[in-house]
């Protein structure tokens, strides 16, 4: 499966989520399950997505002591997810332990990526938590730490992609939320870009939610975005 699109499932009810999922083609996208849905619906929901042949990005952004995060990552691998993430701000040792625990899974291990700076955060937000740096400076710092830990890549806003691609190389995966097709609402994302521009900048995977999930014809919107990014 070669699609670069990850559809973010942000629903309150399982039936609503599955109604959307059953309208789209697993060969054209992967699916992201975040904290709200996973807390409400649990692993059985992920299993239902797997039964429909979708790859799943388990977006739980683990951030805890190293042993706890490593064991959580192992549980995600046992569940069979395609990708799982953690917060780079948890530190080098936390990331290294999470990566090491996946070694026995070999080629079946999920991609392990780190969250750098949330796309809703701006300079003032960082300053309020004691970080006297711009979002780009902090992203670059945490991306280098992630790479040092041996992880597969990072989540970053599309505006940071080109700099990170140059800084971290071609094999480092860049996963970008904040993707909005032309003419759609920016929602709660502050640093946004169109799908075509994000791919041109060097993104590997595009996380897109409401422009697809709230569309009158989700399958057609998904098809159109795939066509636009080639």
Swiss-Prot record:
One of its GO terms (cellular component) is cytosol. The active site is at residue 61. One of its GO terms (biological process) is 'de novo' UMP biosynthetic process. Coiled coil: none annotated. Its EC number is 4.1.1.23. Keywords: Decarboxylase, Lyase, Pyrimidine biosynthesis. Pfam families: OMPdecase. Substrate binds at residues 10, 32, 59-68, 119, 180, 189, 209-210. It catalyses: orotidine 5'-phosphate + H(+) = UMP + CO2. Pathway: Pyrimidine metabolism; UMP biosynthesis via de novo pathway; UMP from orotate: step 2/2. PROSITE patterns: OMPDECASE. One of its GO terms (molecular function) is orotidine-5'-phosphate decarboxylase activity. Catalyzes the decarboxylation of orotidine 5'-monophosphate (OMP) to uridine 5'-monophosphate (UMP). NCBIfam families: PRK00230.1, pyrF. Belongs to the OMP decarboxylase family. Type 1 subfamily. Homodimer. This is Orotidine 5'-phosphate decarboxylase. It comes from Haemophilus influenzae (strain ATCC 51907 / DSM 11121 / KW20 / Rd). The lineage of its organism: Bacteria, Pseudomonadati, Pseudomonadota, Gammaproteobacteria, Pasteurellales.
């Amino acid at each position: 499966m070669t699609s670069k699109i990850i559809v973010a499932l942000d629903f309150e009810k399982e039936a609503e989520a599955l109604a959307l999922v059953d309208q789209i083609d697993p060969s054209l996208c992967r699916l992201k399950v975040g904290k709200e849905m996973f807390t409400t619906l649990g692993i059985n929901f992920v299993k239902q997505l797997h039964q429909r042949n979708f790859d799943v990005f388990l977006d739980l952004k683990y951030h805890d002591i190293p042993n706890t995060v490593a064991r959580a990552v192992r549980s995600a691998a046992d569940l069979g997810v395609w990708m799982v993430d953690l917060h780079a701000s948890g530190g080098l040792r936390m990331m290294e332990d999470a990566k090491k625990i996946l070694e026995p899974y070999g080629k079946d291990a999920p991609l392990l990526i780190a969250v750098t700076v949330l796309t809703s955060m701006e300079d003032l937000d960082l300053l309020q938590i004691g970080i006297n740096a711009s979002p780009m400076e902090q992203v670059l710092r945490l991306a280098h730490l992630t790479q040092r830990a041996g992880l597969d890549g990072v989540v970053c806003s599309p505006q940071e992609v080109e700099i990170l691609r140059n800084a971290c190389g071609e094999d480092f995966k860049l996963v970008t939320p904040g993707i909005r097709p032309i003419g759609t609402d920016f929602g709660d994302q502050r640093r946004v870009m169109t799908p075509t521009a994000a791919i041109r900048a060097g993104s590997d995977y595009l996380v897109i939610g409401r422009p697809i999930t709230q569309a009158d014809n989700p399958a057609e919107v998904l098809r159109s975005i795939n066509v636009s990014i080639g």
